[in-house]
């Protein structure tokens, strides 16, 4: 038997497979890319809708309406490609900049959600103009857009595009609008669901949900986050049915694209539209089955779903077809309703067999199932009836036909057949079905619908003219317009619902009536307390504001609001207009957006709306997500006290200045009428109308001139120096020198300061002369008496040491005296006359040594500064007043000031005082005269205020009630805490600083202490001391000192502070606070935040080693104790036992808890840590601090569970330190003091912000870089040349990386991310390379190194280095638990951990195909870091001390010093050396050199041998890999920077000889030498070849070093190109914290460019060989980023995997 016919033909099969493969490739090449993240159901829906298109899913974004938007984007692409240059109706704001082919865009004025879309529109490009016009109601700036709508615009265009923007325009109206534009073709995308053809109801389909209420249809697709489209049903029906428009503007409508029920309609103007019938839904997947029992009438009292039930139900076609086929073919005996229900239930279940779907199923509701069963049964019954009737009637007809005679047949043939349409079966005489009959059918199948309707054009010229006349007549009668015959425009443009970003817009075309709010309103601060809380106003300032009332007079005209706010004796004016820039106290700018029609205004995070109601003006303020609704009544308020208003204004000003000092971004500058006003917190156009023309206070509460820095701030009052009271009587004997010189009458008014007219202002000085009044007779001479001491009186002390005195500045011992001079520096009146009497030589211009502005400096006969204040009689000039004080700060030493200008020049005291406060130097003194003293006493900086709110008082009283019910607290019966403000002093200090000893018996009446032990201690000293409960009876009206105040129960602390006449708190904020023993939650709820007024840092109790351990909590602690080491472990207990829990106290008789020991001092203590104290110690480090600071000589630690080690108190740190030879002592700290850059030239202001994209594209063009299609490279793994590699079983890699980037052009060498294969490549490529050993003596290399580092002598390692080690660990969030005892048998002691670096290196070369492996960090164990770290730090300090002044090491220098050294080397060139594989080429020779230097410094031999051992053979432990290797340098060991720099110095000094070496700088493997010439030494080749060094030397006029550009004779300049290039590689996500960190880094970099920006452009462009315009553009780009206006792109890029194989070799 032959079987060849059953054998497949290979050629045919291959050809078919090739054709299929080619088709698949073609489909993928032309596939639609789906970018949003989709659920599984959404994916299935989209695949079904988009057939036969091929889809490629690349999820990278989240969309609110993903299904519609994918379809929309595809149809949009089709329309725009066909339309070309066109007019667009209703463009989405976000698409404006993306479509340059659009000639003109028609919009409507934004309302509803359209406003939100315009706010989120791009702010650059063409969209910016449209956005500005839309939001501000401005006319278009050009012809590219309009806000007249498609129907009202007349822009001529041949082709148009309307993407989901015609759903509320009838086809006839569109035809007229196209004719008005002269348009011949219009591509329109519309959403036309078939359900609109059905009666009202709710329709569930497989793709969407449609709710049809009879008038409108709302469609929501699967997975939409909000309601979708909302359209007029009648208009949608017209678009479905209409295929042409007839009349004056004929039109043909053709469906050219369809995706589901989304259509692209091509509207073409045609003179004679022909019939174009079409089937709109040939691929419909639903059949609509009628429900006999439809929805009922109106809803009843209780809501019901009946009214929303469908009269039709969407049934999948496969369900309905199978059900009808099954029912129609059943036997008559088997046909029944139950059998149909059983079959329907069976086919409704989804069945899958593996990946094959055997039955799709149907998830239907009960109503739908009932309707389907009913309709199917009745339909099948009707069909069976038809079948029976047709057969019966047919048989009868056959019998009748066959019984006819010949004559009858001839008659039928002659007369019936001719001229008639013959349809077989008509002669059966069957009945005809009516449309409304049940027999007409129960379902609607959209697949068979055919439409071809014509809509007449609505051109009714005659009717329109008649309507216009009628409208004008009605207007003449004063009635509303009734133009009911106008065509309905509906929603056009951005108000279209069917664009995926346009859902839910509500349109109200009617203009709202503008309501005038003019009138007078009463504003009280108590109404605005919730707003103050939202704004973050301090409680004391809010309390002041709550006591104030204001009257606000409002007038509105010309689209602006003018408010006149009267508060006490002050009147403030504000003007609200759109676009006004508000004052801010930071770099952030705020522009007021004001809409008088909508009665809204907003700026930054604040928004406000107002409405005039019958009760008054209702204002709704929303700030930072918190809202406040207030109703201001009409009328005039009772005036507030002038003193309270002044105090409020002063406190508000200080708050604004405090925010300006300490906040990075600042906020609004709050004016008085901004907090107690009608529209808080806005106060645009602030001005203060004062009745006193010379008060000058109108500038006190604004920041327009407050741009200078701050040298100090207010601090609590310190004790004044005891002195005599100021003279109060005229006949009191006084010293003539002590008189305020400004009240002395001048002999004649000087030309520079003419005499001022008299004024009643209290701020005016007391010059008694007047230009317009006769000179008063001189007062009788006062008797002169010389007192034995100075008569100045201390009024206030600032934290920086500056002081304010009452008296004469001639008593000062400051270096400089400041004279209130005139512009010509001639002898004048007032204080200037007093200076001339004492120091006449100081007015000689020839003796002036320098000038700063108007200020003149002289040293003859003593240091004096002649400062010039502005003349406020001529002009108020606050900026000049600021400059007058600022010009006196160009000096060394301290200065004594008067209040400049408050005499003859009539400068207000408060204004001059504030200017001095902002512009002085630490240690300066200010001397006030009597009128100024009165002002200062009224406005003196107060003590810290503790505000007790009503909630706090209520909670404290509850705690007092609970206390009163106990035996201990019975004294608290009837005691209450009232809301209010308490002023206090708080002396805080380190443990044992003598806080208690500083209290004298004459200064206090009652001492309140937390424990009995402290009470007994105070009583032994003779004080009346009480515990908190018993002290309730004695503290009222007394001077009270509260010891250990933070540990007192807060309700008792508040009670005593409120009852006392004065309260002085003692304590330590870092020690144990009050404990909530009852666990009622009341203690933490009312615990006050106490602000120390003094800090004492010298301890007389704690030994030196204790101070080092607790320095993290007390950075400035110092000790007077002579005990060096007091902490010991594993010794017998001594002295007082201290435990942490009551259980441990019971187990150790005689012990006391740490809480009880707080404040006590013992000679010897034993700390016993038990396991039950773990939670207490871990949650409260204060307990450990208290336990460690109770002894003076010795403390034994018994820590069996290791609890103290977990919080950083480790014996291993101390033991290892002393084991390595450490000593108690103090070296100089290693911190380099770095100053701030002054704005000398400030050329950076000449560089405006620029576009980041243009800057980076220009950088790419000049460097030759291109956009990288990948995120990282996994380079080929090199061969393992030495060592042993342990690999994981799974080498999983990530295929892609998600980043937020500034640009897609990366200018850095793209390395591997942190994943398995990258780690293996780095381990093998960096640490598995063969080491070239070099056996030679180190004498020659050490001798060459002497050129930079001479021979070092023995050094000592002190506790200073130990403290710096502990401080570094604390800053990194580490504790002492990782430092172990030095046991080399333990792997944890010597484990070296490997991490893969994730940062890349800037390069001007290839960024992808570089073929280099990544970089890693091999971190030594914390035990070795703690062992070697102090020694290496001490060696580093010794090297720094031995370096020549022109040799710079690492970062241990001030940047300006290196810049000055480079600037002082003109004529030199720059020698640069770049090491390749610096760490990998280090070997036994470099290690030996390190050990020689360690021996020179006196390091113990066992430590040197241990270091040599660890460096020569090691194991790197990665997360899942490990490598055993030899000799390589580790980047994470404690001496990495030190020994890398030393080896770099040694190689450079040994291999090269320099002529005229001026400057040398070394940092790690980076080095630069400034010299006139160089040559390679004769011994260089031996060292380079022996060690396998890879040096790349460059010698050029300008070089690069450590992120700066080195320009001899000019200095060092920031490397702008390198910094900008590295920014391109950074990931600015995923959270805003990372972006803010990088933005601050950009700000720091720009600060370095402040004075050298222009020079940097010229020099940096030369060193990189780029154009100066590029550097200029990069600086502008950095300013854009610093302003927070950078744009980030979220990208998901693949990882290029080039790894091949890893070869093992064991040695």
Swiss-Prot record:
Residues 56-240 form the Alphavirus-like MT domain. Residues 974-1218 are annotated as: NTPase/helicase. Putative protease: Inhibited by chymostatin. InterPro entries: (+)RNA_virus_helicase_core_dom (IPR027351), Alphavirus-like_MT_dom (IPR002588), DNA/RNA_pol_sf (IPR043502), Hepatitis-E_Cys-pept (IPR008748), Hepatitis-E_hinge (IPR022202), Hepeviridae_RdRp (IPR047307), Macro_dom (IPR002589), Macro_dom-like (IPR043472). It catalyses: RNA(n) + a ribonucleoside 5'-triphosphate = RNA(n+1) + diphosphate; GTP + S-adenosyl-L-methionine = N(7)-methyl-GTP + S-adenosyl-L-homocysteine. Its cofactor is Mg(2+). ORF1 polyprotein does not seem to be processed into distinct enzymatic domains by a viral protease belonging to ORF1, but could be processed by a host serine protease like thrombin. Signal peptide: none annotated. Residues 789-937 form the Macro domain. Residues 60-240 are annotated as: Methyltransferase. Its EC number is 2.1.1.-, 2.7.7.-, 3.4.-.-, 3.6.4.-. The keyword Ribonucleoprotein does not apply. For methyltransferase activity. Residues 1097-1230 form the (+)RNA virus helicase C-terminal domain. Keywords: ATP-binding, Disulfide bond, Helicase, Host cytoplasm, Hydrolase, Magnesium, Metal-binding, Methyltransferase, Nucleotide-binding, Nucleotidyltransferase, Protease, RNA-binding, RNA-directed RNA polymerase, Thiol protease, Transferase, Viral RNA replication, Zinc. Residues 747-757 have a biased composition (Pro residues). Pfam families: DUF3729, Peptidase_C41, RdRP_2, Viral_helicase1, Vmethyltransf. Residues 745-783 are annotated as: Disordered. One of its GO terms (cellular component) is host cell perinuclear region of cytoplasm. The keyword Transmembrane helix does not apply. Residues 241-439 are annotated as: Y-domain. GO terms for molecular function: ATP binding; cysteine-type peptidase activity; helicase activity; metal ion binding; mRNA methyltransferase activity; RNA binding; RNA-directed RNA polymerase activity. Methyltransferase: Displays a capping enzyme activity. This function is necessary since all viral RNAs are synthesized in the cytoplasm, and host capping enzymes are restricted to the nucleus. The enzymatic reaction involves a covalent link between 7-methyl-GMP and the methyltransferase, whereas eukaryotic capping enzymes form a covalent complex only with GMP. Methyltransferase catalyzes transfer of a methyl group from S-adenosylmethionine to GTP and GDP to yield m(7)GTP or m(7)GDP. GDP is a better substrate than GTP. Y-domain: Indispensable for virus replication. The protease domain interacts with host EIF2AK4 (via C-terminus); this interaction inhibits dimerization of EIF2AK4 and prevents EIF2AK4-mediated phosphorylation of host EIF2A. Contains a methyltransferase domain, a Y-domain, a putative protease region, a zinc-binding region with similarity to calycins, a proline-rich disordered hypervariable region (HVR), a macro domain (also called X-domain), a helicase domain and an RNA-dependent RNA polymerase domain. Since the boundaries and the activity of the putative protease are not clearly defined, the zinc-binding region might be part of the putative protease. This is Non-structural polyprotein pORF1.
């Amino acid at each position: 038997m032959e079987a060849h016919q059953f054998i497949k033909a290979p050629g045919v099969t291959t050809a078919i497979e090739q054709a299929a493969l080619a088709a698949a490739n073609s489909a993928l090449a032309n596939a639609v890319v789906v970018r949003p993240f989709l659920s599984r159901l959404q994916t299935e829906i989209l695949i079904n809708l988009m057939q036969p298109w091929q889809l490629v899913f690349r999820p990278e974004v989240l969309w609110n309406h993903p299904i519609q938007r994918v379809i929309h984007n595809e149809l949009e692409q089709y329309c725009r490609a066909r339309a070309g240059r066109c007019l667009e109706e209703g463009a989405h704001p976000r698409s404006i900049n993306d479509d340059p082919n659009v000639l003109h865009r028609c919009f409507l004025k934004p309302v509803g959600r359209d406003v939100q879309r315009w706010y989120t529109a791009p702010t650059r490009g063409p969209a910016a103009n449209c956005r500005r016009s839309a939001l501000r109601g401005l006319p278009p700036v050009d012809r590219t857009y309009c806000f007249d709508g498609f129907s009202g615009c007349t822009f001529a265009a041949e082709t148009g595009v309307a993407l989901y923007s015609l759903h509320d325009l009838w086809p006839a109206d569109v035809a007229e609008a196209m004719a008005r534009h002269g348009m011949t073709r219009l591509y329109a995308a519309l959403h036309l669901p078939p359900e609109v053809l059905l009666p009202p109801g709710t329709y569930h389909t497989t793709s969407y949900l449609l709710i049809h209420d009879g008038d409108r249809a709302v469609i929501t697709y699967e997975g939409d986050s909000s309601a979708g489209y909302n359209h007029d049903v009648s208009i949608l029906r017209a678009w479905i049915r209409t295929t042409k428009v007839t009349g004056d503007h004929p039109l043909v409508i053709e469906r050219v694209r369809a995706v589901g029920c989304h259509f692209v309609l091509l509207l073409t103007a045609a003179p004679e539209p022909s019939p174009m019938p079409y089937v709109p839904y040939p691929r419909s997947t639903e059949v609509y089955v009628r429900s006999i029992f439809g929805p009922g009438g109106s809803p009843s009292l209780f809501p019901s779903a009946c009214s929303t039930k469908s009269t039709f139900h969407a049934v999948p076609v496969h369900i309905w077809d199978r059900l009808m086929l099954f029912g129609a073919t059943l036997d008559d005996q088997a046909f029944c309703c139950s059998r149909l229900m059983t079959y329907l239930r069976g086919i409704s279940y989804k069945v899958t067999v593996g990946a094959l779907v055997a039955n799709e199923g149907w998830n239907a509701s009960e109503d739908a199932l009932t309707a389907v069963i009913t309709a199917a049964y009745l339909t099948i019954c009707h069909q069976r009836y038809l079948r029976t009737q047709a057969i019966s009637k047919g048989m009868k007809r056959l019998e009748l036909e066959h019984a006819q005679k010949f004559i009858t047949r001839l008659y039928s043939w002659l007369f019936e057949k001719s001229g008639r349409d013959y349809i077989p079966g008509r002669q059966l005489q069957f009945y005809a079905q009516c449309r409304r009959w049940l027999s007409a059918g129960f379902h609607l199948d959209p697949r068979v619908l055919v439409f071809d309707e014509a809509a007449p054009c609505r051109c009714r010229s005659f009717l329109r003219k008649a309507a216009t006349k009628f409208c004008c007549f009605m207007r003449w009668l004063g009635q509303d317009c009734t133009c009911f015959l106008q065509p309905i425009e509906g929603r056009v443009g951005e108000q279209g619902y069917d664009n995926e970003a346009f859902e839910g817009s509500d349109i109200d075309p009617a203009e709202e009536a503008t309501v005038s709010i003019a009138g007078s309103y009463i504003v009280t601060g108590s109404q605005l307390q919730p707003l103050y809380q939202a704004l973050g106003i301090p409680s004391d300032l809010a309390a002041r504001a709550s006591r104030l009332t204001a009257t606000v007079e409002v007038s509105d005209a010309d689209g602006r609001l003018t408010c006149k706010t009267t508060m006490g004796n002050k009147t403030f004016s504000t003007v609200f207009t759109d676009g006004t820039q508000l004052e801010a106290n930071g770099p952030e700018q705020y522009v007021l957006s004001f809409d008088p029609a909508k009665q809204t205004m907003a700026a930054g995070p604040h928004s406000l709306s107002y409405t005039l109601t019958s009760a008054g003006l209702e204002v709704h303020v929303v700030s930072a997500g918190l809202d406040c609704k207030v109703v201001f009544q009409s009328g005039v308020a009772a005036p507030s006290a002038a003193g309270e208003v002044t105090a409020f204004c002063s406190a508000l000003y200080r708050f604004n200045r405090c925010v300006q000092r300490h906040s990075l971004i600042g906020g609004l500058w709050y004016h008085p009428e901004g907090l107690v006003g009608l529209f808080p917190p806005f106060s645009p156009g602030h001005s203060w109308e004062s009745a006193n023309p010379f008060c000058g206070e109108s500038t006190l509460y604004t920041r327009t001139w407050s741009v200078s820095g701050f040298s100090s701030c207010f601090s609590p009052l310190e004790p004044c120096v005891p002195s005599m009271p100021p003279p109060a009587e005229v006949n009191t004997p006084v010293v003539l020198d002590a008189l305020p010189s400004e009240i002395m009458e001048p002999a004649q008014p000087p030309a520079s300061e003419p005499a001022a007219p008299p004024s009643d202002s209290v701020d005016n000085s007391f010059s008694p002369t007047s230009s317009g009044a006769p000179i008063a007779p001189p007062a009788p001479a006062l008797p002169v008496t010389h007192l034995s001491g100075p008569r100045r009186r201390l009024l206030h002390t600032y934290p920086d040491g500056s002081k304010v005195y009452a008296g004469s500045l001639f008593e000062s011992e400051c270096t400089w005296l400041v004279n209130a001079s005139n512009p010509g520096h001639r002898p004048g009146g007032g204080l200037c006359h007093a200076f001339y009497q004492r120091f006449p030589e100081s007015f000689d211009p020839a003796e002036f040594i320098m000038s700063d502005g108007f200020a003149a400096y002289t040293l003859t006969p003593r240091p004096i500064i002649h400062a010039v204040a502005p003349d406020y009689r001529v002009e108020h000039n606050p900026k000049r007043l600021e400059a007058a004080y600022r010009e006196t700060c160009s000096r060394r030493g301290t200065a004594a000031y008067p209040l400049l200008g408050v005499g003859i020049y009539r400068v207000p005291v408060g204004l001059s005082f504030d200017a001095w406060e902002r512009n002085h130097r630490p240690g300066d003194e200010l001397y006030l005269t009597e009128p100024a003293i009165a002002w200062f006493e009224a406005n003196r900086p107060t003590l810290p205020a503790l505000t007790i709110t009503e909630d706090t008082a209520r909670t404290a009283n509850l705690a007092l009630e609970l206390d009163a019910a106990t035996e201990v607290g019975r004294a608290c019966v009837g005691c209450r805490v009232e809301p209010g403000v308490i002023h206090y002093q708080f002396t805080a200090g380190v443990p044992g600083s003598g806080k208690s000893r500083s209290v004298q018996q004459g200064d206090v009446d009652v001492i309140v202490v937390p424990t009995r032990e402290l009470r007994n201690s105070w009583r032994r000293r003779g004080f009346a001391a009480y515990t908190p409960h018993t002290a309730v009876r004695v503290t009222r009206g007394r001077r009270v000192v509260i010891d250990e105040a933070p540990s007192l129960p807060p309700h008792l602390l508040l009670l005593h502070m409120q009852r006392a006449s004065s309260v002085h708190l003692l304590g330590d904020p870092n020690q144990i606070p009050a404990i909530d023993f009852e666990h009622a939650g009341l203690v933490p709820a009312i615990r006050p935040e106490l602000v120390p007024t003094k800090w004492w840092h010298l301890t007389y109790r704690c030994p030196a080693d204790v101070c080092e351990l607790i320095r993290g909590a007390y950075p400035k602690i110092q000790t007077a104790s002579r005990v060096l080491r007091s902490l010991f472990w594993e010794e017998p207990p001594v002295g007082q036992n201290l435990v942490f829990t009551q259980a441990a106290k019971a187990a150790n008789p005689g012990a006391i808890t740490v809480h009880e020991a707080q404040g006590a001092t013992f000679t010897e203590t034993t700390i016993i840590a038990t396991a039950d104290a773990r939670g207490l110690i871990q949650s409260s480090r204060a307990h450990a601090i208290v336990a460690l600071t109770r002894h003076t000589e010795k403390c034994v630690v018994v820590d069996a569970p290791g609890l103290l080690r977990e919080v950083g108190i480790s014996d291993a740190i101390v033991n290892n330190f002393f084991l390595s030879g450490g000593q108690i002592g103090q070296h100089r700290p290693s911190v380099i003091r770095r100053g701030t850059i002054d704005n000398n030239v400030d050329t950076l202001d000449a560089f405006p912000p620029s576009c980041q994209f243009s800057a980076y594209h220009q950088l790419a063009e000049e460097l030759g870089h291109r956009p990288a299609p990948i995120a990282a490279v996994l380079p080929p793994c090199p061969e393992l040349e030495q060592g042993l590699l342990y690999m994981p079983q799974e080498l999983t890699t990530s295929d892609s990386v998600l980043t937020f980037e500034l640009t897609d052009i990366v200018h850095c060498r793209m390395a591997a991310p942190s994943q398995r294969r990258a780690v293996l490549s780095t381990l093998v490529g960096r640490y598995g390379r063969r080491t070239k050993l070099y056996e030679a003596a180190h004498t020659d290399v050490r001798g060459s190194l002497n050129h930079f580092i001479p021979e070092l002598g023995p050094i000592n390692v002190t506790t200073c280095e130990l403290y710096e080690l502990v401080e570094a660990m604390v800053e990194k969030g580490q504790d002492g638990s990782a430092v172990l005892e030095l046991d080399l048998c333990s792997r944890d002691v010597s484990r070296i951990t490997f991490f893969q670096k994730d940062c890349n290196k800037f390069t001007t070369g290839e960024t992808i195909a570089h073929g280099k492996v990544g970089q890693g960090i091999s971190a030594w164990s914390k035990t070795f870091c703690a062992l070697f770290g102090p020694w290496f730090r001490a060696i580093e300090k010794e090297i720094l001390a031995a370096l020549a002044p022109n040799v710079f090491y690492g970062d241990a220098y001030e940047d300006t010093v290196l810049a000055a050294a480079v600037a002082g080397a003109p004529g030199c060139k720059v020698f640069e050396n770049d090491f390749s594989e610096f760490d990998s080429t280090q070997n036994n020779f470099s290690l030996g050199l390190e050990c020689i230097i360690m021996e020179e410094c006196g390091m113990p031999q066992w430590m040197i041998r241990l270091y040599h051992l660890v460096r020569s053979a090691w194991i790197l432990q990665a997360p899942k890999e490990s490598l055993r290797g030899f000799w390589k340098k580790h980047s994470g060991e404690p001496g990495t920077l030190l020994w890398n720099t030393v080896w770099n110095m040694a190689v450079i000094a040994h291999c090269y000889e320099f002529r005229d070496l001026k400057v040398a700088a070394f940092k790690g493997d980076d080095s630069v030498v400034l010299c006139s010439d160089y040559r390679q030494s004769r011994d260089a080749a031996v060292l380079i070849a022996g060690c396998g060094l890879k040096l790349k030397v460059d010698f050029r006029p300008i070089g690069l070093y450590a992120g700066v550009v080195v320009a001899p004779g000019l200095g060092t300049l920031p490397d702008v190109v390198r910094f900008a290039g590295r920014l391109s590689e950074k990931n600015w996500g995923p959270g805003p914290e990372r972006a803010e960190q990088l933005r601050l880094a950009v700000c720091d970099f720009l600060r370095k460019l402040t004075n050298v920006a222009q020079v940097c452009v010229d020099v940096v462009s030369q060193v990189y060989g780029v154009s100066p315009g590029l550097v200029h553009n990069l600086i502008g780009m950095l300013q854009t980023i610093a302003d927070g206006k950078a744009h980030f792109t979220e990208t998901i890029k693949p990882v290029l995997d080039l790894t091949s194989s890893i070869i093992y070799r064991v040695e």
